[in-house]
Amino acid sequence: MAEEEPLFPALQEEDDFFRINSDRCSEELQDVKQVLFQEEGDSGSDYGSFKRLGKVLPRTVRAGNMLFPDLFQTNNLLFYERFETYKDYMLGDCKPSEVKEFIAEYLEKALEPSGWKAIWHTDVFDVLVEVTDVEFSSLNAIVRLCEPFLCESRVSSITHESINDLLEVKDQRVPLQELRVVFDESGLYDQTALTIEHVRFFYQQIWRPWDEEEEDYFDYFVRCVEPRLRLHYDILEDRIPSGLVAEYRSLLLQSEAVYMQFTNLRNNLSNKDSDSEAELDNVSMVEGMKMDDEMENLKRKLKLIKNPLLRYLFCYQRNSGSYNMQAKGPRPTGGKVIHVVSTSMSITMLQCLTRERLQPECSNKDLEIQFHRDPLEAVNACYEGDLVIICPGLYTIYGLINIMDSIEIEGYGLPDDVIIEKKGKGDSFVDCNGAHVKISNVKFVQHEAVEGIITIHSGTTELDNCVLQCETTGVTVKKCAELLMKYSDLYGAKGAGMEIYPGSKCTLIGNGIHHCRDGILIKDFIDVVYEIPKIIMENNVIHNNEGYAVVLVKPSPNFEKNSHTEELEGEHLDNNMIEEQASSNVLQPNLNEAMGVEDNAIEKSDHLEEEKSDPTIAKEEVECEYAIDCEEAEGNQVIATELVANTRRKTQLHKKRLSTLGIVTADDNNLTSQEIFVSIVGNQFKRNGKGSFGTFLF
């Protein structure tokens, strides 16, 4: 028993050991909880910097004078970082009149008042200073020049004495927005650098001089800060057309100029003696009212661009290119010009180009040839009837190729050798508006785009032997436009490879459409009752799409009933359409091949029965051969049948609506006068996720 007694002290030591470790774990757990689950009273301790979670600001080396110290890199913050800071720490639910007060409180809690160095950055010079104090209410810092004196001037007259004199005039006060905090490895001034960046960004990108005069009953962050912040990052990430961005910046400059004039006029009126200058005041009042109306109009336009939905509805179409440009027509001096595009031209290339393309085109020896380095520049220089020849190479463009005149764009070589790559997410790639446009032997490549690759707004466009590497939507054929697409390859669209609108005409021959969300999307809206897409599809291969090879978008029967109360027999229309289509005068697709295959299969089956062979084996052979031969023909038949039935349905709906207005039309079966033509033959539909054809009802 005596030998066992020492075990108890050992156990006591182990208890102390576990108790100490347990206390240490509790302290660490408490620290984690304090970071992850802060109380409301502690919620302002980090002010959006995430410093306590281990985030540190990187340093950046200034370009230019290498004597300057490194700075904190704060200009590459993400959207959510700025969003959270403005919402949770800086502005909260303040009103427009309370913005400066809230920012001053934020600075007082988050900013180190002294002891840090910064570069005072202006348009004229950069100079190293030390901050001795901060006036939070006026957003100014009290500074002094550092020793040794470091200055980088953009003019030759800046000296140590001139900077000292300037500081004396300004009472040593410098706006916080003009300070860039010098990098410090200790981490003490990370929060200071980040705070100044948030204030600087707010006054440069978010705040407007007229915000204080807005109604004071709404949440400033919700009404102004959030949409402006989102718009800034949409512009930064190229999600908005460049034309709309230019318009937005122009509107901002106009608004600031008009507001400054209006403010000056208002101040002058308030300082005048109303008795001695009454007549002048009346003129100024009228001028002020005009400025006020102009300012309100500019603010309305800015709000349209700021709101994502209104921006899409009212602004995108005006900046798509077709609304901003007009066709040039024939060249004033007459004649045709050949535009040759090449980044570099060797003698061999020039000889081959001259022999194979230029000489056959140049029946007139005086025909002008212009050379360009950019396809966009060449297209913009074109007049009616010009030819653009693009030599092999990779061409990167940053704007919209807007084709307004009847021109021809031809790649000299194979499509994989003539590549046009689009940079910028917001702009469309190619817009076709010319009466007759032809593009051949060119590969178009999109990266991270939000618009389609080619849009035909009007006229006739021919795509021959082209490759289209899409990002969102592929080719869009708008109302009253016509597309002839031959022997081309289209792939990669996250939406539909092709969108065909009502009233358009689309001819597809020998193309490949693959690896898209859907192959072809045919839009048949009830609003455009009598204008249906006219489609010819022959010998295309539509394969490996995520959804359907072909999708028809049409209104549901319930929608049709609600849109026209007198259509009580609407539910019988779809059933009668297919039954009546055989007796109509509409040109039907060539379905005899499918019926012939079926007849052959039946004959072979009968022949096998007569020979009294194994009935199981005979049945399997017949079904297998029939399935292989009819796979493509069945898909063509289903699509054509549905389109023809939909044509008759819309025709009867249109006539029924006209009859309610007392308008008498031709006989229902006389559809040939409408020139309806649907030909869908010889197409192959393979490995599409949902099948060859689908219908989407809305």
Curated annotation (Swiss-Prot):
Biological process terms in GO annotation: fibroblast growth factor receptor signaling pathway; regulation of neural precursor cell proliferation
Keyword annotations of the record: Cytoplasm, Cytoskeleton, Repeat
PbH1 repeats: 480-502, 503-524, 532-554
A Pfam family it matches: SHCBP_N
First-listed, main subcellular location of the protein, grouped into a coarse class: other
SUPFAM superfamilies, alphabetized: Pectin lyase-like
Location(s), subcellular: Midbody; Cytoplasm, Cytoskeleton, Spindle
This protein's GO CC annotations: cytoplasm; midbody; spindle
InterPro entries, per the entry: Beta_helix (IPR039448), Pectin_lyas_fold (IPR012334), Pectin_lyase_fold/virulence (IPR011050), SHCBP1-like (IPR045140)
Function: May play a role in signaling pathways governing cellular proliferation.
PANTHER family linked to this entry: SHC SH2 DOMAIN-BINDING PROTEIN 1, SHC SH2-DOMAIN BINDING PROTEIN 1-RELATED
Protein name per its UniProtKB record: SHC SH2 domain-binding protein 1 homolog B
